[in-house]
Amino acid sequence: MQVKENKQLCLISLGCSKNLVDSEVMLGKLYNYTLTNDAKKADVILINTCGFIESAKQESIQTILNAAKDKKEGAILIASGCLSERYKDEIKELIPEVDIFTGVGDYDKIDILIAKKQNQFSEQVFLSEHYNARIITGSSVHAYVKISEGCNQKCSFCAIPSFKGKLQSRELDSILKEVEDLALKGYKDMTFIAQDSSSFLYDKGQKDGLIQLIRAIDKQQALKSARILYLYPSSTTLELIGAIEDSPIFQNYFDMPIQHISDSMLKKMRRNSSQAHHLKLLNAMKQVKESFIRSTIIVGHPEENESEFEELSAFLDEFRFDRLNIFAFSAEENTHAYSLEKVPKKIINARIKALNKIALKHQNHSFKALLNKPIKALVEHKEGEYFYKARDLRWAPEVDGEILINDSELTTPLKPGHYTIVPSAFKDNILLAKVLSPF
């Protein structure tokens, strides 16, 4: 029997879903604390930071400073994760309000660091395994599973390899064991994540690692549904797309950040890919029945000229992505693009505004295409007093939209899980739907 300490923990997990998995590992080590969302009441405030781009760094720093103001006398303030790792040599002096700093190598030792009240930065990047106890947050039916850590790509704009290191993939058996354990606890929907998911097992000399994973999950039959985030174009193949299409468990969800479509820009970005390869993959994805395609674009990378931008803009309007993330270029230390001549901010902002207009048009069309037809969905939890929150099974949590189901139209309360529903109305990125039946 686990006995709770009479101490409260406030955990703030910033950044991506990969960071969230590491935060959940830390929660697993700190299971004997009572969780609170109020930093002023906490005995320990733990902030798992993001250090990806400038806006994320600023958010992390501001969150730390706010927590420092809120913390009560005697409380411990901890900054872990990417920001701490990336700036470990100077961060202790820059933010003296923090009691403990730790990076990306010691999530599974957080209880020891708190007990000893010491900083620690291990050289080896931590990669969660099946034996690392996690406390899953946010859902009783969905969990993220991290399949690898680090990245071997050499994109001109990305600093991640400088603090996350080279690609290190988990053993397939470890992933299957984690999936089985989580499924037995009721997590029947999972999202598989990594910095570069399509390169899974490349570091172990296997080029079809992600296909192996898909087929092993299908054979295992522990899950009802799953999807994969963060495919990298140069390591994505037609065979991989086919494996996803053929899977009874993995949804026809394709999240592949292309960053640009112009060949000259892809070369400047050091993406190790080409427009022809992008189009081959994207058109194959679009041919898959009921496919859902998400991508990411960087606007204003150094040396992006008007012609290259117009080529990108025309392509995005023609291809019609279901969802599109558009980022302004962020100059990051220890990257090739950091010292290159910058595109003026005024031009970047104008370009982003134009692309956002295109993205919103096609996003709304994607939502409306679901109206008045049965779709498979995951009901996650009650949202407020009158609604249940759900999402299309193809969608990733949090980022692709939400569906609300009015409980006044139900004869019995809904349990979290898989249902067939019919969306009937759409407004402000939200679909309203009725439940037909569970499946």
Curated annotation (Swiss-Prot):
The keyword tRNA-binding does not apply. Binds 2 [4Fe-4S] clusters. One cluster is coordinated with 3 cysteines and an exchangeable S-adenosyl-L-methionine. It is found in: Cytoplasm. Its cofactor is [4Fe-4S] cluster. Pfam families: Radical_SAM, UPF0004. Keywords: 4Fe-4S, Cytoplasm, Iron, Iron-sulfur, Metal-binding, S-adenosyl-L-methionine, Transferase. GO terms for biological process: tRNA modification. Its main location: cytoplasm. Belongs to the methylthiotransferase family. RimO subfamily. This is Ribosomal protein uS12 methylthiotransferase RimO. It comes from Helicobacter pylori (strain J99 / ATCC 700824).
